A protein has these predicted regions:
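Beta-strand-rich interaction surfaces with strong enrichment in secreted/lumenal proteins
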Residues: 65-66, 258-260
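RNA-recognition motif
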Residues: 66-73
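Active-site helix/loop of acyl-thioester processing domains in fatty-acid/polyketide metabolism
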Residues: 234-251
Length: 281
């Protein structure tokens, strides 16, 4: 992450500068566009492998639209509308490269292509799923609609769902990096929220001995669509997630209280984490 900063659009806090990251899912172009997808497995992980592929694409005037690259594999969408080559021809030329092990491809349908070459979606060693913000917003609104916007049942349900998710996430991190590295890697664990599209979460304070922490969340996905529309803090799922995650970090049950929220007009959501009171859910 660079040290470059910018003023956040919804507040005076200076936060690290982030660039949007597109999910490698689909591409849409004008009707009649010749879209295609390639998924190439390299025989090793050597410098220059991708350059050899892009040389072929450049020679045939193939426009790369988007892609996803990981060790020894590169998947990408292309626009062949101005190209002199067919998908099949490109596959043959790519297969002829010395470091290419396999090449998969598919053609789009009248200017639209959706990734049909990869499953499941993975986050590290764990399977992941994607939801659009409007979709998950509708899902999280439903318990409030059923049990009443201000009633406790919907809030408790969302909070407990979040708590379970946070505990599960931290356990997965522990299995990946080792339990003894969790405290050291807490800044990176906070960065996972941004990487997953949840928002920009900043760890402002932490005291491992007392089991307390303060987190600021910019663009909190649970609240951002209700910005400035409500009088009290709105986040239930995210505060539950933080409570579950930090309960695992501190190895004791803690609660997360949202002390300010963007739905109230604040520039960010602020959560205070502290040991749970006896008898709390």
């Amino acid at each position: 992450m660079t040290a470059e900063t910018k003023e956040h659009a919804t507040g005076s806090e200076l936060i690290p500068k982030y660039s949007p990251k597109g999910a490698f899912v689909a591409e849409v172009a004008a009707a009649g566009s010749r879209l295609a997808q390639f998924s190439i497995e390299f025989s090793g992980d050597k410098p220059g492998e991708i350059r050899a592929v892009t040389d072929i694409l450049e020679r045939h005037k193939v426009n790369i639209l988007s892609g996803s690259h990981e060790s020894a594999r590169w998947s990408f969408f292309v626009d062949l509308s101005q190209s002199d080559a067919s998908t099949a021809q490109l596959v043959q030329e790519l297969k002829a490269l010395p470091d290419i092990q396999t090449v998969q491809s598919q053609d789009g349908l009248n200017g639209v292509i959706v990734d049909a070459l990869h499953h499941p979606l993975m986050m590290g060693k764990n399977r992941a799923v994607l939801f659009r913000l409007d979709t998950i917003g509708s899902v999280f609104s439903r318990p409030r609609e059923i049990f009443g916007a201000e009633g406790p049942l919907g809030k408790v349900l969302l909070h407990q769902m979040g708590r379970a998710g946070g505990q599960s996430s931290l356990k997965a991190f522990s299995e990946t990096m080792g339990r003894d590295r969790i405290r050291e890697q807490l800044p990176n664990i906070m960065n996972m929220y941004a990487a997953g599209g949840w928002g920009i979460f900043k760890l402002m304070e932490v005291d491992f001995d007392r089991g307390v922490a303060v987190v600021q969340a910019f663009e909190n996905f649970e609240c951002t669509t209700h910005r400035g529309k409500r009088g009290e803090p709105y986040s239930q799922y995210v505060r539950g997630d933080l409570a579950g995650l930090f309960s695992e970090v501190f190895d004791k049950k803690v609660d997360a209280v949202e002390t300010q929220c963007v739905v109230q007009g604040a520039p960010f959501c602020r959560f205070e984490i502290a040991p749970a009171s006896k008898g709390t859910a």
